[in-house]
Amino acid sequence: RTMKTALYVARIIHHDIVYAGAKSWQWWRAIGGDYKDGLIREYTTDDNFLDGRVEDSKLMWALGNYSRFIRPGAVRLSVSAFDQTGALIPDGDTDQQGLMCSAYKNVDGTYVMVVINYANEEKEFSIHKGKVGNTQWQIYRTSDKEGENLLPVGTVKSGKTVQIPARSIITLQGK
């Protein structure tokens, strides 16, 4: 179970929402055999298909980084990225081989940011206070590590920096 397909699909979701303006996003293959595109995989262990095992996929958890936190009626917020000198990076919310970020405000007032790290190395991500003020963010991470499936990995306040492991997805939820 790796993040390869999960990251690829997360990048598609990001582009569909950020650039194509998609208002919803669905995945049609929920369960399947040994297919890379099944959210849940089933494996038979006998020739009569009477016994087997069922496993979740990293793809399911990557989709969950969006679907668990971004609720119906949410509004997408603009995201700006700056380099180390403070200069604005055009289209900085999308480095297809690095960090991709989208942000949302749910109807209940909670904020959500989904950050994809497509790179093969750890990246830093700073949360500027901007319109969200001094928000406390819960961090959830999905990565190649066993058990790191929307795993709560700590909190961070606006204005601080978050380390995002290589080839992982984090969701930050704040109020």
Which residues fall in each region the model found?
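Active-site-proximal beta-strand/loop segments in catalytic clefts of secreted hydrolases
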Residues: 27-31, 116-119, 142
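Glycine-centered loop/turn motifs
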Residues: 71-78, 134, 159, 167
